[in-house]
Amino acid sequence: MTLMLTLGTAVFGAQKTLPSGKDTGSINVTNLKPGDTVTAYQFVKADYNEYGFTGYSAINNYVKDPVAPTAQEVIDMASSAATMTVAAEKKVATGDTEVTLNGLPVGYYLVMVTSGSETVYSPMIAGIYYSKSATDNTLTNGAISADSDFEIKAQKCWAK
């Protein structure tokens, strides 16, 4: 009887950590060249209340739909990136081909790469987001391959 009560307490006593504004994640950008500089600008943030995560909202109206930016919105943000707040920036070290931007709040980011060589990169987007249910603070971190094509709402885009 004692063993059953102890096991029951362990199972029922475990509590999930609710999503909160303190949650952070990372964006990993691969297939870069040494000397490239990766800069991330947050354009969508996560919203919370006392019960946890409530959804996403656009920062400064950069996008109409926070979870479905259009290709034109990405182009417009890239054109005005100089006016946006830098969330993180990191230079690719000699001998490396990737960078990881850590400690970023949950949300979506415009990622720009300034080339240290002759490579030209197009603007990219990445997200740090909760699971669909958002019942705990488990995050999916952003990942971008800088030399891959991608689509936004079925419109072809190119990473470089």
Listing of model-derived features with the role each one plays in the protein:
Residues 1-13:
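Sec-dependent N-terminal signal peptides of Gram-positive bacterial secreted proteins and lipoproteins
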Residues 14-21, 93, 108, 115-158:
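Structured interaction patches on ligand/partner-binding surfaces of diverse proteins
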Residues 23-27:
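Structural beta-strand segments of beta-rich domains
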Residues 28-34:
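Structural motif
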Residues 29, 101-102:
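Hydrophobic core positions of the immunoglobulin-like beta-sandwich fold
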Residues 37-39:
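Beta-strand signatures of extracellular beta-sandwich domains
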Residues 51-99:
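Short, acidic Ser/Thr/Gly-rich low-complexity loop/linker segments typical of extracellular
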Residues 97, 104-113:
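A short tyrosine-centered beta-strand micro-motif
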